[in-house]
Amino acid sequence: MDTVGQIIRIKRESKGLLLRQVAAHLDIDQAILSKIERNERKPTKENIIKISEILNLDKDELMVQFMSDKIAYEIADEDCANRVLKIAEKKVKYLKAHSVKN
């Protein structure tokens, strides 16, 4: 299963773009983009939006990958990770139904 970093790298390479070219459009150092692609650093939400535009990726799908990576990395080492996800899903449904904002 590809991470958001792998998705970005695969798409960038398929378009024949260099790290420095994409990094320049993002206004970040190419070393940072390289770390994002290698999953050594997490992109910001703003980076995800810009990357989707630069690489012509579906913004919503890339955002789903970004958010799911964040959650997965946060709870992966927990013994109760699956239970946490099930309860979190119920909480999200509740919050959406009751229009609760954080």
Each PLM stretch: what is its role?
Residues I8, L19, Q30, K45-I48:
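Helix-turn-helix DNA-binding elements, focusing on the entry/boundary residues of the two helices
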Residues R12, A23, S52:
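The alpha-helix within a helix-turn-helix
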Residues G16-S34:
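Short alpha-helical DNA-recognition segment
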Residues D27, T44-E61:
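DNA major-groove recognition helix of helix-turn-helix/homeodomain DNA-binding modules
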